[in-house]
């Protein structure tokens, strides 16, 4: 009985895999990931706050109950930061429990917000919509915009099943693949512009590809402004992108053209980046070879980036990002040691300076020395030891560079057993005898 009691709730074993998946979510783009300690802190804090739920298993239903209760709490001024961290960590755990794999904490919070919007929409308008549109049930799990039988439209958040399906396709085939484009084009037919852009932003994918997609969207917006001067019946870029609109406003019939234009812009951007990815000389495919110096790699990379038909800010972003991600493992480690946490934001010149010696004989000797350097207790033991030859700390007498004194002839550089004068007979050939004494205190 004592053995069973000791295992009760210890470490939340039912959430072992969930916590493991949560530890892969990053705090922000390019930042560190959540740790197991973060997850356990959140779970134990929740158990402490809501003692009535402590004995219940950690199912997704319990998590939603806790989420709703946390929304109703008002933290003190000194605890607002910890409270926000608690909510963010819980959102990540909930996403992992549902099988989703958001890249960042912000993406996880966005997913839960979308689910939350769906739930609130169902509770507030479910009965009314069902009465006006009896055949709604077979459509409601896919389409955010629904035409009501009595006229008008109703908006609901993107269903998590659809979001998860898109996420799976993006992970398996790539964010700019034809498979993902087809899936997004199909579902986005009845999405608002805000839905399309939010879902696209939360998809897993290469950061450089996402930046290129955003650059293509900006180009489409600039082209629209040039070809469509402002007027009373002309859509603005903000209307097309869903800026400054509520979801209910964006779902109405007068925004159909704006939604379709936004959808087409996104599809065009995906195709453009995909064609760039498959074209010879694509910067994202330029990677440092094992025998190539970092300077030669940077020369090839910058040449490929400068040849791309993208804006200068996009080129700068690609140079800063790919100069690290596409470098060899040795160069990445050297940049991490030299530049630290700012390695992702460092300029190309700083990275070249950090990697100037990578591959040289001196660098290889340095790596070998680091590999052979004693570690742990053995490495710290010699620090407090004292040499009995010269009296200085930090090394032993057998390691002393000042040499040793022969107690037969009194000369330095050899021991008494190796003394040449010892083999000669006669006391007259023998030097003055040296009496051993304590080393001088230096």
UniProtKB/Swiss-Prot annotation:
Residues 420-442 are annotated as: Disordered. It comes from the Viruses. Pfam families: Gag_p24 (PF00607), Gag_p24_C (PF19317), zf-CCHC (PF00098). One of its GO terms (cellular component) is viral capsid. GO terms for biological process: viral budding via host ESCRT complex; viral translational frameshifting. A zinc finger (CCHC-type) spans 385-402, 404-421. Coiled coil: none annotated. The keyword Metal-binding applies. The record marks 363-364 as: Cleavage. One of its GO terms (molecular function) is zinc ion binding. A motif (PTAP/PSAP motif) lies at residues 436-439. Keywords: Capsid protein, Host-virus interaction, Metal-binding, Repeat, Viral budding, Viral budding via the host ESCRT complexes, Viral release from host cell, Virion, Zinc, Zinc-finger. Late-budding domains (L domains) are short sequence motifs essential for viral particle budding. They recruit proteins of the host ESCRT machinery (Endosomal Sorting Complex Required for Transport) or ESCRT-associated proteins. Nucleocapsid protein p14 contains one L domain: a PTAP/PSAP motif, which interacts with the UEV domain of TSG101. Belongs to the Ovine/caprine lentivirus group gag polyprotein family. This is Gag polyprotein. It comes from Maedi visna virus (strain 1514 / clone LV1-1KS1) (MVV). The gene is gag.
């Amino acid at each position: 009985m004592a053995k069973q009691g000791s295992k009760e709730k210890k470490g939340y074993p039912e959430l072992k895999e969930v916590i493991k998946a949560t530890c892969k979510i990053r705090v922000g783009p390019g930042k560190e990931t959540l740790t197991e300690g973060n997850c356990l802190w959140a779970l134990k804090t929740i158990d402490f706050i809501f003692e009535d739920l402590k004995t219940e298993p950690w199912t997704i239903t319990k998590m939603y109950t806790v989420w709703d209760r946390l929304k109703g709490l008002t933290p003190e001024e000194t605890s607002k930061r910890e409270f926000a961290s608690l909510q963010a960590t819980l959102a990540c755990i909930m996403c992992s429990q549902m099988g989703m794999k958001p890249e960042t904490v912000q993406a996880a919070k966005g997913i839960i917000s979308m689910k939350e919007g769906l739930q609130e929409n169902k509770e507030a308008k479910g009965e009314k919509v069902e009465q006006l549109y009896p055949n709604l049930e077979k459509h409601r799990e896919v389409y955010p915009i629904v035409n009501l039988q009595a006229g008008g439209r109703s908006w609901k958040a993107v269903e998590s099943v659809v979001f998860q399906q898109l996420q799976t396709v993006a992970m398996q085939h790539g964010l700019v693949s034809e498979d993902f484009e087809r899936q997004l084009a199909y579902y986005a037919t009845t999405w608002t512009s805000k839905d399309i852009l939010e879902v696209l932003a939360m998809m897993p994918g290469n950061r450089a590809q996402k930046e290129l997609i955003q650059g293509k969207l900006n180009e489409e917006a600039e082209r629209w402004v040039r070809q469509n001067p402002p007027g009373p019946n002309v859509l603005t870029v903000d209307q097309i992108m869903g800026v400054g609109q509520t979801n209910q406003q964006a779902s109405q019939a007068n925004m159909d053209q704006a939604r379709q234009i936004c959808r087409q812009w996104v599809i065009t951007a995906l195709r453009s980046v995909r064609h760039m990815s498959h074209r010879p000389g694509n910067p994202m495919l330029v990677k440092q070879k094992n025998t190539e110096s970092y300077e030669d790699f940077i020369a090839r990379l910058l040449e490929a980036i400068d040849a791309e038909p993208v804006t200068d800010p996009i080129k700068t972003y690609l140079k800063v990002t790919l100069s690290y991600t596409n470098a060899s493992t040795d160069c990445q480690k050297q940049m991490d040691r030299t530049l630290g946490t700012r390695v992702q934001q460092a300029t190309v010149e700083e990275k070249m300076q950090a990697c100037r010696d990578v591959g040289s004989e001196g660098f290889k000797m340095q790596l070998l020395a680091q590999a052979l350097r004693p570690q742990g207790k053995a490495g710290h033991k010699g620090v407090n030891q004292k040499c009995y030859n010269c009296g200085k700390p930090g090394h032993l007498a057998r390691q002393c560079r000042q040499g040793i004194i022969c107690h037969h002839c009194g000369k330095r550089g050899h021991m008494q057993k190796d003394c040449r004068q010892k083999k000669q007979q006669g006391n007259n050939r023998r030097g003055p005898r040296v009496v051993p004494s304590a080393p001088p205190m230096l």
